[in-house]
Design a protein with these regions (language model features):
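Adenine nucleotide-associated cytosolic modules
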Residues: 1-176
Length: 176
């Protein structure tokens, strides 16, 4: 929705900002056209109330998880592969991504979105759930998707919620 063929060659951060400002000219959008690193992520995230991660690679998911834990920020992680996706929300004191997947996989062993493809509507489903989680966190209404992983399968139109208790031996959040 944010990016069209007319945006080919443009930085995603610019095309997304431009479209969002056209939707609501009263919003303030801070953009960062740089690589997210273990050094820059905590500095950027500390300025925000809630972080939404929706990248297409595990390296970034672990980086966002680790940086948010380091600065005590709540966040939503979302991922898509082929016809489905998954999402979870973390607030301090609840399970983090490393509670479920303690060790980051070797990128060469995991197919990426470019090689296996994604169903655009599945992206919309997971993105809408992440947007809902963000609104629920900010407004304090409803029950967040903490200590759980929501798995959506668009090929069967099923949703499963997997219990994700905080791991007392988590290498990252068990100390927080």
């Amino acid at each position: 929705i944010l990016h069209t063929t007319a945006d080919l060659g443009r930085a995603k951060v610019e095309s997304a900002r431009d479209k969002l400002v056209r939707l609501n000219p009263n919003i303030k959008i801070d953009t960062y056209q740089e690589f997210l690193t273990p050094e820059t992520a905590p500095e950027i995230f500390k300025n925000y109330d809630f972080v939404v991660e929706c990248s297409d690679n595990f390296q970034t998911k672990y980086l966002v998880n680790d940086a948010c834990i380091a600065v005590g920020k709540p966040f939503s992680l979302g991922g898509i592969r082929m016809l489905g996706g998954q999402t979870m929300t973390h607030v301090p004191g609840t399970a983090c991504y490393r509670c479920l997947f303690p060790i980051e996989p070797d990128p060469s062993t995991v197919p990426n979105s470019s090689s296996v493809g994604v169903l655009g509507s599945a992206v919309g489903i997971i993105g809408s759930i992440q947007a809902t989680e963000t609104i629920k966190y900010i407004t304090g209404i409803g029950t967040l998707l903490t200590d759980r992983l929501l798995v959506a399968d668009a090929s069967t139109m099923t949703f499963n919620t997997i219990s994700l208790p905080r791991n007392p031996k988590c290498p990252l959040c068990s100390e927080k």
